[in-house]
Amino acid sequence: MKNRTLRQITAAGVIAAAYAAISLVLAPITFGAVQCRVSEALTLLPVLSPAAVWGVTLGCAITNGVGAATGANFLGLIDLLVGTAATLLAAITSRLLGKIRFGGVPWLSVLPPILFNAVAIGAEWCYAATGSINVAFWAFAGQIALGPVSYTHLTLPT
């Protein structure tokens, strides 16, 4: 039992470190109203391991925290809370949907990272830009969804 727990903690730590490292190395495209957070591709790992749920969540929190502290993340501490919560919900939902397979592939598990991030981060940017959530939300959500759609497409089996 101890070895299994240690393995899961280690896996979560490695995933968190990878998420943060990828995000921060690619900071110019990680933060912004139009972003491609390549590390969000790791939100598909919870399909394989429950440790990945905590790994991607911690990695996102580290990334958003460092981004807020350095000024790279314009949304600051709000994104630390909202963005990390969106990643946590996406990871949990991807894990749950990973059990539903078509042709042996968990196709539905790719949707939560796209949808949760588009809604949460799109709402953050809409509010930051306009002072309210209004029709501009759809433009921001669409821009945010483009990043996850691009990397999700690359991670799917052909």
Positions of the model-derived regions?
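Membrane-interface helix caps and helix-loop-helix hairpins in membrane proteins
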Residues: 27-29, 72-77
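Hydrophobic transmembrane alpha-helices
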Residues: 2-54
